[in-house]
């Protein structure tokens, strides 16, 4: 299971961003080449394991977009993108995010009080992006049904759970050891389900 995902992760180059070990992968960066079979495998496993039920899928720019697109096509659930750019639309909510290697503003549009949503992103690492978005959605009185990432790296999922009460569900857990990506399965029914 998830053979393409695991192989792509194990073959990922690792670079340093300050003190942060950053792996470069099609799932998290769109480079090297993102094969459609990889996206298909990831989306099928998300649907199989987590069976998203919601009015909307919320993804975070930029690397959540391709996962939300494929998931939307598989489930028939429309998606909306939390953007890094302000549009000034009525009801727009600005969110300040801090990660292990950057900080900035995100903007939520097209999400209303009472909406039932699934939040999807490529990876949870420090938890900074998910924390900011989930806290904003809570303030907006949005019904967050699930929080799903393809990859769990570091302590971010624990931080998100402790600070928001939401369990981040992921397909695999990774760690960077001696400049290489190590991949660990998270079995269905495992700690994130």
From Swiss-Prot:
It is found in: Cytoplasm. Its EC number is 2.4.2.8. The keyword Glycosyltransferase applies. Transmembrane segments: none annotated. One of its GO terms (molecular function) is hypoxanthine phosphoribosyltransferase activity. It catalyses: IMP + diphosphate = hypoxanthine + 5-phospho-alpha-D-ribose 1-diphosphate; GMP + diphosphate = guanine + 5-phospho-alpha-D-ribose 1-diphosphate. GO terms for biological process: IMP salvage; purine ribonucleoside salvage. GO terms for cellular component: cytoplasm. Pathway: Purine metabolism; IMP biosynthesis via salvage pathway; IMP from hypoxanthine: step 1/1. InterPro entries: HGPRTase-like (IPR026597), PRibTrfase_dom (IPR000836), PRTase-like (IPR029057), Pur/Pyrimidine_PRTase (IPR050118). Gene3D superfamilies: 3.40.50.2020. Keywords: Cytoplasm, Glycosyltransferase, Purine salvage, Transferase. Belongs to the purine/pyrimidine phosphoribosyltransferase family. Archaeal HPRT subfamily. Homodimer. NCBIfam families: HPT_Archaea, PRK02304.1-4. Catalyzes a salvage reaction resulting in the formation of IMP that is energically less costly than de novo synthesis. This is Hypoxanthine/guanine phosphoribosyltransferase. It comes from Methanothermobacter thermautotrophicus (strain ATCC 29096 / DSM 1053 / JCM 10044 / NBRC 100330 / Delta H). The lineage of its organism: Archaea, Methanobacteriati, Methanobacteriota, Methanomada group, Methanobacteria.
């Amino acid at each position: 299971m998830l053979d393409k995902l695991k192989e792509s992760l194990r073959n990922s180059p690792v670079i340093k961003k300050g003190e942060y070990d950053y792996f470069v992968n099609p799932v998290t960066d769109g480079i090297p080449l993102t094969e459609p079979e990889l996206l298909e495998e990831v989306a099928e496993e998300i649907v199989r394991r987590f069976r998203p039920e919601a009015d909307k899928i919320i993804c975070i720019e930029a690397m959540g977009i391709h996962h939300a697109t494929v998931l939307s096509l598989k489930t028939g659930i429309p998606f909306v993108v939390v953007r890094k750019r302000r549009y000034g639309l009525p009801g727009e909510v600005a969110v300040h995010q801090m990660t292990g290697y950057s900080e900035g503003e995100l903007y939520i549009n097209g999400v209303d009080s009472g909406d039932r949503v699934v939040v999807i992103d490529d990876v949870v690492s420090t938890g900074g992006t998910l924390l900011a978005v989930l806290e904003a959605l809570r303030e907006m009185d949005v019904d967050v049904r699930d929080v799903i990432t393809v990859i769990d790296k570091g302590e971010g999922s624990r931080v998100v759970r402790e600070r928001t009460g939401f369990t981040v569900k992921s397909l695999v857990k990774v760690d960077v050891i001696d400049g290489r990506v190590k991949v660990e399965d998270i079995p269905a029914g495992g700690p994130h389900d």
